[in-house]
């Protein structure tokens, strides 16, 4: 149907009798969603709306990311490789969306932010329960974080539940063990509240996979999916740190942290260290025995 006079007529089949029926706004509860932006500055600072929406939309994407990562764990528990890869693919796209969102907040100038920063009090993104939940799902376990949520017993209980359960990576290692890979016994059952750190005893497992990709294609593909997730997560962390640096410089954070310096430390935290370390030894014909010192300087 051609458009005449820059006007598009409604088609006969379009529903207009919506009284008492499910609508777009009703399904999405837009009345609640769009009334949740309540600036605290008086008079309301124009740019506080940007700040609120930036963080609210981030929390929505984090909710979806947690949903997908939980599904990935369940799929691994049931050896459902392709279903796991599907939700990991979506997780990567969510992380890209979260990363690109920082470009919107970067339009906030230092003076604009300082115009309403005082109303934030001690509130801080560090207190994002969903962010900590996702870090725990991915393996960055830190029981100290629970202290931050002492004011929220229900939220703290949610965090404790995921703290005490195997992470995505630990479920992946258990999956590998079920399919005949020589995963050390401690990864079958251990204190899951302790963060995973790089372990040289796992390197032979991943050398075998990466040097025999035709034979272990499913395992290799999952490894690369996890590498993609960590890489994108670190890009998000980096953009966060750079955005904070751009807006507030090296001021302390509202939550009491050192600000940029504290965010920089997060860039050294890893989820799946062996999947990066293995690349150093892949294809090397002669490797020193495990634990041998490097004498080549």
Swiss-Prot record:
Which keywords are on file for this protein?
Dioxygenase, Heme, Iron, Metal-binding, Oxidoreductase, Tryptophan catabolism
Q: Which PANTHER family match?
A: TRYPTOPHAN 2,3-DIOXYGENASE
Binding of substrate: at which residues? 51-55, 113, 117, 254
Essential cofactor(s): heme
Q: Which reaction does it catalyse?
A: L-tryptophan + O2 = N-formyl-L-kynurenine
How is this protein named in the record? Tryptophan 2,3-dioxygenase
Domain of life, per lineage: Bacteria
An example GO biological process term is: L-tryptophan catabolic process to acetyl-CoA
* Molecular function terms from GO: heme binding; metal ion binding; tryptophan 2,3-dioxygenase activity
Report the record's disulfide bonds: none
The similarity annotation says: Belongs to the tryptophan 2,3-dioxygenase family.
Q: Which gene encodes it?
A: kynA
Cofactor: binding comment: Binds 1 heme group per subunit.
Q: What is the lineage of its organism?
A: Bacteria, Pseudomonadati, Pseudomonadota, Gammaproteobacteria, Lysobacterales
E.C. number, please? 1.13.11.11
State which residue ranges cross the membrane: none
Chain sites annotated for binding heme:
240
Question: What binding partners and quaternary form does the record give?
Answer: Homotetramer.
Q: In which pathway does it act?
A: Amino-acid degradation; L-tryptophan degradation via kynurenine pathway; L-kynurenine from L-tryptophan: step 1/2
Q: What does this protein do?
A: Heme-dependent dioxygenase that catalyzes the oxidative cleavage of the L-tryptophan (L-Trp) pyrrole ring and converts L-tryptophan to N-formyl-L-kynurenine. Catalyzes the oxidative cleavage of the indole moiety.
């Amino acid at each position: 149907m051609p458009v005449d006079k820059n006007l598009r007529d409604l088609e006969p089949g379009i529903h207009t009798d919506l009284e008492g029926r499910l609508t777009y706004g009703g399904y999405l509860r837009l009345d609640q969603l769009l009334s949740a932006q309540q600036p605290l500055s008086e008079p309301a600072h124009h740019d506080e709306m940007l700040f609120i929406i930036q963080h609210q939309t981030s929390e929505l994407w984090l909710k979806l990311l947690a949903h997908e990562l939980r599904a990935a764990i369940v799929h691994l528990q049931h050896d459902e490789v392709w279903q796991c890869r599907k939700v990991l693919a979506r997780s990567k796209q969510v992380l890209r969306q979260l990363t690109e969102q920082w470009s919107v907040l970067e339009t906030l100038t230092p003076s604009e932010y300082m115009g309403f920063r005082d109303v934030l009090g001690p509130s801080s993104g560090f207190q994002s329960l969903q962010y900590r939940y996702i870090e725990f799902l991915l393996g960055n376990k830190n029981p100290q974080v629970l202290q931050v949520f002492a004011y929220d017993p229900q939220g703290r209980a949610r965090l404790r539940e995921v703290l005490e359960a195997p992470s995505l990576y630990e479920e992946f290692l258990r999956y590998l063990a079920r399919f005949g890979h020589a995963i050390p016994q401690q990864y079958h059952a251990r204190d899951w509240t302790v963060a995973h750190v790089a372990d040289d005893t796992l390197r032979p497992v991943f050398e075998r996979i990466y040097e025999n990709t035709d034979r272990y294609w499913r395992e290799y593909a999952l490894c690369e999916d996890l590498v993609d997730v960590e890489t994108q997560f670190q890009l998000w962390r980096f953009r966060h740190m750079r955005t904070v640096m751009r807006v507030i410089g090296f001021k302390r954070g509202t939550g009491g942290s050192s600000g940029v310096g504290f965010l920089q430390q997060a860039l050294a935290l890893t989820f799946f260290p062996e999947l990066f370390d293995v690349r150093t030894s892949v294809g090397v014909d002669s490797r020193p025995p495990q634990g041998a010192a490097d004498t080549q300087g």
